[in-house]
From Swiss-Prot:
It is an enzyme of class 3 (hydrolase). This is Glucosylceramidase. Glycans are attached at residues 37, 160, 388, 552, 560, 698. It is a single-pass membrane protein. Optimum pH is 7. It catalyses: a beta-D-glucosyl-(1<->1')-N-acylsphing-4-enine + H2O = an N-acylsphing-4-enine + D-glucose. It comes from the Eukaryota.
């Protein structure tokens, strides 16, 4: 193809637009966006983090990394083909000191960080990140003053929050977490986070008496806590958009990471939903958490431990908060004030007054989290984004998602933001919960929706791929059915590095992490989904992981890079040093398609890439234009000139640019006329592979025996479950007979 000039794509907000369900470039080609979350380090302040009671002093300047290091990190991500970045920003980073006082140093740092991406052709969207509402609830996100406005006591390093069971705070304190390391998600059901989420979304409905005084236009007024929190959040969003929204490296903003309804929608304050809410450790009911938070020692609080085949089971009951610590600075629980419950001095226990309080509005009608609270706020947020983008040039997408582990809800067009992108998350919940991945994988998504247990078990690597693919396609199909032609991007997906008792740290054998990651990315490819892997965190270390709640997801670590370079027999400054799983993360994919994608697959073992798409046939013998050729990323770490072959559908022309790691493909037949091939977008295919690479998966005898044993256990569980149901039916029938005098 001598003499033909092929342009390499450079992502830029000014040249990306949305057409139906696709992102497209300025040439009308369909973009496949993939990249990383940068980074988990941004969940916590720069070292050293202040004490909880000194939360106003928190600074996030230098998170995720120092500006002088940025060029190397962007170059590394580009070399891996990960050019679509989700930038983690917390509300606390923007406004930690007090309401209305923004950290200008951080905003200047963030702007410079985003500008530094431009020479590398990377593009980003900004995600306002939260987990469990705030660091001061045991997660990340909102500033400490939001909890104080609601009445929580953050004094003395948050001691009363911890002692009263209102929050699990051990995981946000720097260092290796001892004991049970999977407790942080249970924070959503603890008093602090559940209350804050309820107040943020539905304070006017569920806590109308909770007012916050403040000045507006020089006058002191009292506003409902919902209005106070939402106005502050939207003002912080406006500040963020004004600071970076004009940059061509910024192609969008995300409303909120993994929004949660808190208490809204729970059927009874006597229990949480076992099928959707992780029950682990000391796990009080909402009523028990009210009692504990109000400073009462509370008996009969269940303690859950890990089990099989159900994830957890009750193994004991304890008297929680025996010290009588109170989570409220005023010593008054707002839920007691609103008549949800009361403390009985006579019985020395909490009594429910309105057990279904959180499913009704003020008029007694049933509430719906999405329709009544979430969608109205999305519309307010959309207005703020639109009003504060100073430049109309280029795409500013609006990323939104559903409640974690829920499928896309019904979402009317009038409730959707402009340039909407649906951005769900997906993880293998069984691997996350057990910190194990091996011969057997489980479809937790299916189990939560009533799938028979034997259908939810998968054995072997190929089956794990099928498991992941089914779960991803279920999420995508639900979004397609509810939203129609709206782009879908998986904003988070990833694999823990510390699975299987941290064996890989000791042996250097990352095969199980590689298999899980390969299954994950293969599932995304099978569904033609773009994605952001969680997470690229240079601050990661083997001993403390990402230094937040014992999570360890980063496949790159500066600490490991330093060790490897120090111990290397010969000097190496390659960008790959310090990374893991690159054999499955760095893979070919279609960057820009002249036509419509129909299927994508990559076998990381065989190094075999197959891409099918519908593309027009050219009739000109002249050099193809960017509108006419498809551009594929072909990483040189896998595909070498001397060992790579390819085939292409009839009429296909291929140009490989080995230096720039690109394949350009187009289809032509100069013997035809334009009229004869009008609207001809027939299926095309290109296959690229490395000669002689093929690895077969074989089951060992031990693995076969394990599969048989598990299947037998599944049958027994099903049998006894059916016996239990029959016994229940028998008792009901007997009761009916007695009631009718039979």
């Amino acid at each position: 193809m001598s003499g033909i000039q092929f342009d390499v794509s450079r992502l830029c907000a000014a040249t990306i637009s949305i057409q139906g369900r696709h992102f497209v470039d300025s040439h009308g080609r369909v973009l496949h966006l993939r990249g990383a979350n940068v980074s988990a380090a941004s969940k916590v302040p720069a070292t050293p983090a202040p004490k909880i009671h000194d939360h106003a002093q928190a600074s996030y300047v230098g998170r995720p990394f120092r500006l002088e290091e940025a060029d190397e990190h962007w170059a590394r991500l580009k070399s891996w083909g990960l050019t679509f970045v989700r930038i983690t920003v917390t509300w606390e980073a923007l406004e930690h000191k007090e309401r209305g006082v923004y950290d200008e140093d951080y905003l200047a740092y963030l702007r410079a960080l985003l500008q530094s991406m431009e020479p590398y052709g990377l593009v980003a969207y900004i995600a306002l990140h939260q987990d469990v509402w705030s660091r001061y609830c045991g997660g990340s996100g909102a500033p400490g003053w939001t909890l104080e406005a609601a009445g929580f006591d953050l004094s003395n390093e948050g001691e009363n929050l911890s002692l009263s069971g209102a929050a699990f705070l051990d995981g946000i304190k720097s260092g290796r977490l001892a004991g049970e390391r999977g407790l942080w998600p249970t924070g959503y059901q603890k008093l602090a986070a559940a209350t804050m989420n309820t107040l943020f979304w539905g304070g006017e409905t569920f806590a109308p008496l909770l007012k916050v005084p403040g000045q507006i236009d020089g006058k002191w007024v009292s506003r409902n806590i919902q209005v106070y929190l939402q106005e502050a959040f939207l003002a912080a969003t406006a500040k963020l958009v004004k600071a970076v929204g004009d940059l061509e490296t910024v192609m969008g903003f995300e409303l909120m990471n993994e929004p949660h309804p808190g208490f809204i929608g729970i059927q009874s304050i006597h229990e949480w939903d076992y099928t959707t809410d992780l029950h682990l450790g000391q796990f009080p009911s909402p009523l028990q958490s009210f009692s504990m938070g109000a400073g009462h020692p509370t008996p009969n609080v269940p303690v859950y431990t890990r089990s099989f085949p159900f994830p957890t089971r009750v193994t004991s009951h304890v008297t929680a908060n025996p010290e009588g610590a109170c989570a409220w600075a005023s010593k008054e629980c707002p839920w007691e004030k609103h008549g949800v419950w009361r403390w009985s001095e006579a019985k020395q226990e909490a009594a429910a007054l309105q057990q279904d309080y959180f499913v009704k509005n003020r008029d007694g009608g049933k509430v719906d989290f999405y329709e009544d609270f979430y969608f109205p706020f999305v519309r307010k947020w959309e207005q703020v984004i639109g009003e504060n983008i100073s430049s109309t040039k280029g795409l500013k997408a609006r990323m939104v998602e559903a409640i974690p582990n829920e499928l896309c809800p019904e979402w009317k067009e009038e409730s959707r933001p402009k340039n909407m992108v649906y951005a769900p998350h997906w993880y293998d919940l069984n691997t996350l919960f057990k910190k194990k991945f091996g011969f057997m994988s489980v479809n937790v998504q299916g189990l939560a929706r009533g799938m028979f247990i034997l259908r939810a078990l998968y054995f072997g690597t190929a089956a794990a791929k099928a498991n992941y693919a089914l779960q991803i396609k279920t999420i995508v199909l639900a979004a397609r059915l509810k939203l129609g032609p709206v782009p879908v991007i998986f904003g988070e997906c990833g694999v823990p590095m510390d699975i299987n008792n941290e064996e890989a740290f000791r042996t250097g054998d990352w095969k199980w992490q590689e298999r899980s990651m390969d299954a994950l990315i293969s599932a995304m490819e099978g569904a033609l989904m773009g994605f952001n892997l969680w997470t690229y965190n240079p601050a990661n270390r083997d001993d403390i992981g990402d230094d937040w709640n014992a999570e360890n997801f980063s496949w790159y670590s500066e600490s490991n890079r330093t060790k490897l370079l120090k111990n290397a027999e010969k000097s190496s400054d390659g960008l790959d040093v310090g990374a893991r799983l690159l054999n499955v993360i760095v893979r070919p994919y279609p960057i820009a398609t002249a036509g419509n994608p129909t299927s994508l697959a990559y076998d990381a073992n065989a190094c075999a890439f197959t891409y099918r798409f519908r593309s027009p046939l050219r009739v000109s013998a002249a050099a193809p234009t960017p509108e006419e050729y498809t551009e594929i990323f072909l990483p040189r770490r896998v595909f070498r000139k001397e060992s790579t072959e390819w085939t292409v559908t009839a009429g296909g022309k291929v140009h490989v640019d080995w230096e720039r790691e690109r394949v350009f493909v187009w289809f032509e037949d100069s013997s035809l006329t334009a009229a004869s091939i009008k609207d001809d977008t027939r299926p095309r295919r290109i296959d690229i592979w490395v000669i002689g690479r093929k690895v077969e998966e074989n089951w060992s005898i031990a693995q076969i025996l394990v599969a048989v044993v598990i299947l037998l256990l599944g049958v027994l569980v099903a049998y006894y479950a059916q016996l239990y149901e029959w016994e229940k039916d028998k008792m009901i029938f007997q009761h009916l007979r007695e009631a009718n005098g039979m």
